[in-house]
Swiss-Prot record:
It comes from the Bacteria. It is an enzyme of class 7 (translocase). GO terms for cellular component: plasma membrane; proton-transporting ATP synthase complex. The lineage of its organism: Bacteria, Pseudomonadati, Pseudomonadota, Betaproteobacteria, Neisseriales. Its EC number is 7.1.2.2. It comes from Neisseria meningitidis serogroup B (strain ATCC BAA-335 / MC58). ATP binds at G169, D170, R171, Q172, T173, G174, K175, T176. This is ATP synthase subunit alpha. It is a peripheral membrane protein.
Length: 515
């Protein structure tokens, strides 16, 4: 066989000319150890803090400890199949979750994957879970109300759009019930709600979703669930994922409300991760940055001004402010609000609603302690009519508590003291409200107006709630224009007051309310 040198030369030349030298450069590392969802990796020299790492079997992790000779990462999900010697690659991306209107009405996990069996979520938009909070110049002061529909909250500790109001109390004091009422009350207001369930039983979360569906609230709600059975890493990132989903609406000039239920369990999950990563423990074995864990999350709840919205939407939305209101929940142990995490979150938020076991067991629900519950900015956002009529409620309750304690030692009370005690009892009774029976501004104003003008002075305490309910029904049927006027203007005119006075007289003459 004759070899042709020229032919061979041409073949080699063609091969060299067509040689593809494109190479994908990816930093790879090797798994050194796997323990309790924490993976130590050698060789990832270019890893970023918070970067997504890819493990075999399409599993992802989060780089958290960048040390001299190894990287400590947490696995986001199952880790049983990861073994020593496996190859890990850097993705070059920070953890992102899907965002957009397509998520509304769905139940997703901490990574934004649907878990409600209703098929895939068709959104192309994603956003990083960690974002820098809006700066001072980008913010606008809180001056619009975020109505919860609960008399005790809207009259005494009002919440404004863009505020952070902590709900704090022992277990089984109705913390979730207050938050769910606030979500249900946003129906028809255009406010998108995000409910983040952290470390709860799957059955409890299913129950919450069912209740929201029953009251038509899932139409404007996203539920982010990281159940107690899921990895600690997912419980740790769930609030950040939910916050990113809420920021999508805030940055487009809309209003959103986010509930974190609850941040105590997130702190416990973060403590677990930190201790397994061998980070030095501090007070109550929490790591040193547990304050920053919550502050960087809650600072993202804000009201942003028109210029910021215009800038973030590239000029598409003009003249609109956006807001993200946060209702974080903290569970205390035996009423100890001076523990590490409760004191941290109290100092970060713009006020707190204290729920007490004794009040709850006494049948006062919502079990709000009006004496130590405050709203530091909500007063500026309160509806005019509620601010005017509700001003005396807190004072009446404070005086009642003081006199009630004093009256235990005194046998004979003068007439003025006795009247004040009776008034306080009626106010306490009227602040009670059943779950999912929220009131609008006008209905709430009606009750407060009746308290202020002494309409309940001759009504027995036991019949006060029934009297309130019947009077509301009476005004709804006989004078609906009064309620419409108050809802429309946010104030009560002299004409409306005269109509209500006549209505009260007429109602009292026809309704048998005496003992």
């Amino acid at each position: 066989m004759q070899l042709n040198p020229a032919e061979i030369s041409d073949l080699i030349k063609a091969k060299i000319e067509n040689l593809s030298v494109n190479a994908e450069v990816r930093t790879c590392g090797t798994v050194i150890s796997v323990t309790d969802g924490i993976v130590r990796i050698h060789g990832l020299s270019d890893a970023m803090q918070g970067e997504m790492l890819e493990f075999p079997g399409n599993t992802f992790g989060l780089a958290m400890n960048l040390e001299r000779d190894s990287v400590g990462a947490v696995v986001l999900g199952e880790y049983e199949h990861i073994k020593e010697g496996d190859t890990v690659t850097c993705t070059g991306r920070i953890l992102e979750v899907p965002v957009g209107r397509e998520l509304v009405g769905r139940v997703v996990d901490a990574l934004g994957r649907p878990i409600d069996g209703k098929g895939p979520i068709n959104t192309t938009l994603t956003a990083p879970i960690e974002k820098i909070a809006p700066g001072v110049i980008a913010r606008k002061s809180v001056d619009q109300p975020m109505q919860t529909g609960l008399k005790a909250i809207d009259s005494m500790v009002p919440v404004g759009r863009g505020q952070r109001e902590l709900i704090i109390g022992d277990r089984q004091t109705g913390k979730t019930a207050v938050a769910l009422d606030a979500i249900v009350n946003q129906k028809g207001t255009g406010v998108i709600c995000i409910y983040v369930a952290i470390g709860q039983k799957a059955s409890s979360i299913a129950n919450v979703v069912r209740k929201l569906e029953e009251h038509g609230a899932m139409e404007h709600t996203i539920v982010v669930a990281a159940t107690a059975s899921e990895a600690a890493a997912l419980q740790y990132i769930a609030p950040y994922s939910g916050c990113t989903m809420g920021e999508f609406f805030r940055d487009r000039g809309e209003d959103a409300l986010i509930v974190y239920d609850d941040l105590s369990k997130q702190a416990v999950a973060y403590r677990q991760i930190s201790l397994l990563l061998r980070r030095p423990p501090g007070r109550e074995a929490y790591p040193g940055d547990v304050f920053y864990l919550h502050s960087r999350l809650l600072e993202r709840a804000a009201r942003v001004n028109e210029h910021e919205v215009e800038k973030l939407t590239n000029g598409e939305v003009k003249g609109k402010t956006g807001s993200l209101t946060a209702l974080p929940i903290i569970e205390t142990q035996a009423g100890d609000v001076s523990a590490f995490v409760p004191t941290n979150v109290i100092s970060i938020t713009d006020g707190q609603i204290f729920l007490e076991t004794d009040l709850f067991n006494a049948g006062i629900r919502p079990a709000i302690n009006a004496g130590i519950s405050v709203s530091r900015v909500g007063g500026a956002a309160q509806t005019k009519v509620i601010k005017k009529l509700g001003g005396g409620i807190r004072l009446a309750l404070a005086q009642y508590r003081e006199l009630a304690a004093f009256s235990q030692f005194a046998s004979d009370l003068d007439e003025a003291t006795r009247k004040q005690l009776e008034h306080g009892e009626v106010v306490t009774e009227l602040m009670k409200q059943k779950q999912f029976s929220t009131l609008n501004t006008a209905e709430m104003a009606l009750t407060l107006w009746a308290i202020n003008n002494g309409s309940y002075s001759d009504v027995p305490v036991a019949k006060a709630l029934a009297f309130e309910s019947e009077f509301l029904s009476f005004v709804r049927t006989q004078h609906p224009e009064v309620l419409e006027a108050v809802n429309a203007s946010g104030a009560m005119s002299d004409e409306s007051e005269k109509t209500l006075e006549a209505a009260m007289k007429s109602f009292k003459s026809s309704y048998a309310y005496q003992a």
